[in-house]
Amino acid sequence: MMNDTEFHKLVDHALMIIEEGIDESGADIESETTGNVLTLEFENRSQIVINRQEPLHELWLASKSGGYHFKYNNGEWHCTRSGEEFFALVKRECSVHAGETVDWS
């Protein structure tokens, strides 16, 4: 069972990967972190919002396709419903919102 400090370190790292990955991808996506929330805004004004839910030790993602909850297990964040890996879903959602493939290493 992870403690709150470990949870925040893992989330901070995940959000940094997303911000750096978006920069690396060259896609026209603005990212802004305010408190516990990372907002990705696209050219068409649509948004993806990612925030941390400390009491549950979950990452939540909201986009026009719906809401997703992720738990950390065995070194990765996975969707509590589908099991999809967090970064794969973020890239897919970014690609849908941007209207182009958004990918990073």
Curated annotation (Swiss-Prot):
GO BP annotations listed: iron-sulfur cluster assembly
A GO term from the CC aspect: cytosol
UniProt-listed InterPro entries: CyaY, Frataxin/CyaY, Frataxin/CyaY_sf, Frataxin_CS
Keywords: Iron, Metal-binding
Listed GO MF terms: ferric iron binding; ferrous iron binding
Cross-referenced Pfam families: Frataxin_Cyay
Coiled-coil regions listed in the entry: none
Domain of life of the organism encoding this protein: Bacteria
SUPFAM superfamilies in the cross-refs: Frataxin/Nqo15-like
Family: Belongs to the frataxin family.
Its job: Involved in iron-sulfur (Fe-S) cluster assembly. May act as a regulator of Fe-S biogenesis.
Protein name, as recorded: Iron-sulfur cluster assembly protein CyaY
Organism: Photobacterium profundum (strain SS9)
Gene: cyaY
